[in-house]
Amino acid sequence: MQPEKIEHIYQSNLELFSQANVSYQQWQHEPILDFDADERIGKELGWTAAPTKSLFMKVKGGGHCLLLTHRDSRLNSKLVKQVLGKRVSVCTHEEMIEEIGCAPGAVCPFGLPADITLLVDPVVYSYQDLMFTPGKPDMTFAFAASDLDKLLQKLPNTVIPLPGE
């Protein structure tokens, strides 16, 4: 982990929600770095928002992208290749830390370098509320899924919605 990058991502998230005028809930808790801890802490804190997953991937031929999806969804690499025109592979923990500074299990979909393409799985729109880690593994944000597009429009990243399956 790179604490300065994580702090930057966290502050970028606070600014993003403010600029987009999107309400959110915030919790501080023990660090969540895997699905078991996520589920346990979620039950303890009474979370009802849908947990998201941010898969950080490298694109064949250069560059990176991130897939924002539901925690239980699986990567459809054929669909991603169809959309990007190139194959992708999930980055190793070391590559991810080097590129964006996030801890494995605490990758944030917002506040990333502008050259990272953000792919959005349409499944996330089927939930009332979404939650994610804003860079810091001991923090969780939740917001209305209906506000996702307001947030995405404020990002400097290229945002590509995946077609529904």
What are these regions (language model features)?
Residues 1-165:
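Extended, low-hydrophobicity, polar/charged segments
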